[in-house]
């Protein structure tokens, strides 16, 4: 690399500022790191990958990846504020729950919250032993029933808590045990697909725009 190019790169980093990443209200507005930008507007729409452990300080949640998206920047305070984009459990963790001579039943469901957010939720239920196709079908039906009963009665923040801290998974397991012995249920993944607006639901896509 030429000296001129090295100098240009160095100058580019010199003008960048570091912004503190702040979680949304549902996670108590805690700081989860910093991100650089030479212009604040370029941060808008940037996705942040953190963990529930980083947010809560509880090591038992180190396997829960939380995806946030920057939607607002305070240039004076050097803070980047975020909204919830989705979550996903670490694949190694899911792999550790999958055992020989047992079954994994996965269901993917699109559902709306009470306050107008459209979500895609993936549920994994693990049985104690290998079960039959008819039992898998019945358990998947229970997954669907619980998701479609609980989520529309909650706000997005309530759904986030119910997904990440086990309330929805526990309800699915309790009902599914009437069909077959259940070892565990996890809300493996979620994604916000739509968000409310004055004109109605819009795709949950945030695009950075330079100031006029």
Swiss-Prot record:
A GO biological-process term: translation
Record key words, sorted: Ribonucleoprotein, Ribosomal protein
GO CC list: ribonucleoprotein complex; ribosome
GO function term, MF aspect, one: structural constituent of ribosome
Signal peptide, first to last residue: none
Assigned protein family: Belongs to the eukaryotic ribosomal protein eS1 family.
Name of protein: Small ribosomal subunit protein eS1
Organism: Ignicoccus hospitalis (strain KIN4/I / DSM 18386 / JCM 14125)
Name of the coding gene: rps3ae
